[in-house]
């Protein structure tokens, strides 16, 4: 792990450098899988608040995220779309939204008594220098790059990861300037 910082209240930009000598050839729009080991964690003790950032901490405190605990009893894998594009080097960038339990129905307050997401919780505990096991690339969400037809991307929240990869590849690697491209992005406000 070389970086794991919040880029929005509940979204991390998680960047992993591949081991020396390793290279991943992929088409923008692909995804990678990350191994999630067995673990127990307490959000208050195990999530590095400095990696959330001062800008986002008040919302985490307001919504009671630091009261959450998570336990994964069986090793598993989860798939995340890669936000990086090939020219960014031998690294994998994921955008990960913390998967919190749903809120209690009113008039109750707080979260329902179910576990938060096991993969997002694990990823939110990782710090620069930590080692993770990942595999890939996988998937077939690949646009036709050599067409003249308009490209329209629609995404929201952390789901914009593969769209970033495709847009950056088209504009920075292929230097496409004569093809109409539209990007529509939606995000929740607090």
Model regions: which residues?
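Ferredoxin-reductase
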Residues: 1-128, 187-189
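FNR/FR-type flavoprotein reductase catalytic core
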Residues: 68, 98-190
